[in-house]
């Protein structure tokens, strides 16, 4: 019986990609009081209408759906990860393979093709985070095993990167029966690929977008150059940045960006450069530079460009920095949102890193994720800093975002930056 149990556990595991078990959540960290200085759409606020309807305030074009039922990265969100759940297939239910395939490709639900390759020219772009399921039916697994793996794979594979689709009510019981029916139709031989790029296991990674420091190629460079005028312009208090920082921005700010994020004793918290600008500029010049405002981001790029080529040298040894880094690491491995995902699921080598999530190639934290931020996003025609990128990640996870200048995001950014220590700053980047 023990051998049979081990075989069943192995069979259940074949649908997903796993990894080492993530560290347990650390106890709640005492975050200092902080009133967000971000623009309204970047504060992570929820509005409640007269009818009680909750609407999330986010950037233009982003969903306004409230994901308040699911836990977040907030340090005061003490909700535990939902417990693994046993799924019970509906008695006598017969699945519809055609409907199951439609669900497998449904972008509002998954799509499952974001991680798994299956046959069909309409499957584009497929991902490689999970195994190729093109011949899954040849494995002849029992329906109950497949159903449980779709309902909640954590019962047998705690470190899975696959969401608990049924337990989190993303797919209904009837829909999972249809998915099981579809998966059982997938048999070999697999027809030859007509396009090698359809298959994420043979697809070539993008070569990039050219010289990121060429102003004719990267609009973020032009915006940073324009920010020099703001540097010299007096604010409401009659002072400008240039009055205290002698020389050009390139001269005065050389080396500054190499030290951020850092613990700022005056404010009792970790601050990224954008966070510091939001308080320092107003305090000294009277000019507000709220987080995620164009002015804040552009000045940040200008200051970081002054340190291009210099190695990042953040504090990783002081007791305050070490504690903050540990909290950031805990956040990195914390599962959040409707899909119960962690940053680590996409950005560590034993999980999703260096693989395709749909058409997106997932970066590896070990290679460094921070030194090209802020970056020009060709898909958005905007300059994004690291915090907006973090907020954007929350939407597909089904989690409410925090304020862009929250201490939680700052300490997560600090942890990420430890992997870039010693590597040269190269800002602004270009990414899709």
Task: Go through each PLM region and give its residues.
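Glycine-rich, acidic and aromatic/proline-enriched surface loops and short helix-turn segments
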Residues: 106-109, 118, 152-156, 182, ...
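Gly/Gly-Pro-rich "capping" loops immediately C-terminal to redox-active cysteine motifs
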Residues: 113, 117-151, 161, 167, ...
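Short sequence/structural segments immediately N-terminal
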Residues: 32-35, 40-42, 48, 63, ...
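Bacterial N-terminal signal peptides that target proteins for export
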Residues: 1-9
């Amino acid at each position: 019986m023990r051998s049979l149990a081990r075989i069943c556990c192995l069979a259940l595991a074949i649908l997903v990609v796993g990894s080492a078990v993530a560290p347990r959540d650390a106890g709640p960290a005492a975050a200092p009081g902080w009133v967000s200085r971000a623009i309204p759409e970047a504060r992570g606020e929820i509005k409640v209408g007269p009818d009680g309807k909750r609407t999330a305030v986010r950037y233009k074009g982003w969903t306004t759906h409230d994901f308040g039922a699911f836990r977040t990265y907030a340090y005061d969100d003490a909700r535990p990860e939902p417990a693994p759940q046993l799924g019970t297939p509906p008695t006598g239910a017969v699945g519809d393979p055609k409907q199951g395939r439609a669900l497998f490709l449904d972008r509002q639900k998954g799509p499952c093709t974001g991680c798994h390759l299956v046959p069909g020219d309409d499957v584009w772009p497929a991902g490689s985070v999970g195994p190729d399921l093109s011949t899954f039916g040849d494995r002849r697994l029992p329906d109950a095993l497949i159903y449980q793996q779709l309902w909640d794979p954590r019962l047998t594979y705690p470190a899975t990167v696959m969401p608990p689709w049924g337990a989190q009510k993303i797919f209904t019981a009837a829909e999972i029966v249809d998915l099981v029916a579809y998966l059982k139709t997938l048999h070999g031989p697999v027809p030859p690929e007509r396009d090698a790029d359809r298959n994420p296991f043979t697809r070539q990674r993008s070569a990039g977008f050219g010289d990121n420091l060429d102003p004719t190629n990267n609009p973020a460079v032009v915006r940073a150059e324009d920010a020099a005028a703001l540097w010299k312009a007096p604010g409401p208090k009659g002072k400008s940045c240039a009055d205290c920082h002698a020389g050009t921005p390139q001269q005065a700010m050389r080396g500054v960006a190499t030290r951020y994020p850092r613990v700022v004793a005056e404010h009792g918290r970790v601050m990224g450069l954008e966070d510091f600008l939001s308080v320092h500029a107003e305090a000294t010049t009277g000019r507000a530079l709220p987080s995620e405002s164009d002015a804040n981001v552009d000045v940040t790029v200008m200051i970081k460009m002054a340190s291009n080529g210099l190695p990042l040298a953040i504090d990783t040894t002081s007791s305050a920095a070490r504690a903050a880094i540990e909290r950031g690491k805990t956040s990195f491995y914390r599962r959040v949102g409707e899909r119960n995902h962690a940053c680590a699921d996409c950005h560590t080598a034993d999980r999703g890193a260096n693989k395709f999530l749909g058409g997106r190639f997932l970066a590896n934290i070990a290679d460094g994720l921070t030194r090209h931020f802020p970056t020009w996003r060709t898909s958005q025609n905007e300059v994004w800093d690291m915090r907006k990128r973090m907020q954007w990640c929350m939407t597909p996870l089904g989690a409410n975002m925090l304020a862009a200048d929250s201490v939680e995001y700052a300490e997560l950014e600090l942890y990420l930056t430890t992997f870039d220590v010693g590597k040269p700053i190269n800002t602004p980047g270009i990414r899709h």
